[in-house]
């Protein structure tokens, strides 16, 4: 093996060792209506919490992407409760559900989406002041348990382990926004430092 061939083999081996996820799927349900954005682009929307959306998307060459979700609760205030359930599945099989042990999920409340013009759904938006989610029942339990069978069929594999969530009490807020940054975690108001996706995966 000459020096040039040896270099090429080593370079290819290095690329294989540093593979980053370049494809992913996001599965979402919201009560009552929702929109899903990937790096600022609308990729899914629906209005039936028992009919979740399952959408493929790409991440950039560094393995980074922003998933931004808006959910509207149609019953104002205490007349009803809102909920959002989601997970992100990377091409290596890693699953990132809405759950307490996935600190990258953050949220905010605000005006209806039609009245919001601050580019909240884009990668450049500063979400450092957003707060952790409030979690309720795990999928298949609680208020939304009645739709489990239908939703499971639509979700497909793998099994959903996410929890229904909201931003602050779900009988008080009706216009809610969510972020998850693949590749890094948002800086939270408590002062948590940004964490590289590689380090997050290594901790699993």
Region roles according to the model:
Residues 23, 33-35, 85:
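Exposed beta-strand and adjacent loop surfaces of beta-rich binding modules
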Residues 53-57:
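Short strand-edge motifs at loop-to-beta-strand transitions and within beta-strands
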Residues 59-63:
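Surface-exposed, short loops/turns at beta-strand junctions within beta-sandwich domains
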């Amino acid at each position: 093996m000459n020096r040039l061939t040896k270099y090429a083999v080593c370079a290819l081996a290095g690329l294989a060792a540093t593979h980053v996820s370049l494809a992913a799927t996001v599965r979402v349900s919201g009560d009552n209506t929702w929109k899903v954005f990937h790096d600022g682009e609308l990729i899914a929307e629906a209005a039936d919490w028992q009919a979740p959306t399952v959408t493929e998307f790409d991440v950039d060459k560094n393995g980074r992407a922003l998933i931004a979700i808006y959910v509207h609760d149609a019953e104002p205030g205490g007349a009803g409760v809102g909920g959002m359930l989601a997970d992100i599945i990377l091409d290596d099989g890693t699953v990132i559900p809405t759950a307490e042990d996935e600190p990258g999920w953050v949220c905010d409340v605000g005006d209806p989406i039609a009245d919001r013009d601050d580019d909240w759904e884009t990668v450049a938006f500063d979400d450092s002041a957003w707060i952790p989610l409030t979690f309720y029942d795990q999928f298949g339990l609680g208020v939304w348990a009645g739709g489990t069978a239908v939703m499971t069929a639509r979700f497909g594999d793998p099994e959903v382990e996410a929890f229904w969530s909201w931003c602050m009490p779900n009988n008080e807020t009706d216009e809610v926004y969510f972020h998850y940054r693949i590749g890094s975690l948002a800086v939270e108001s408590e002062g948590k430092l940004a964490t590289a996706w590689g380090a997050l995966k290594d901790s699993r």
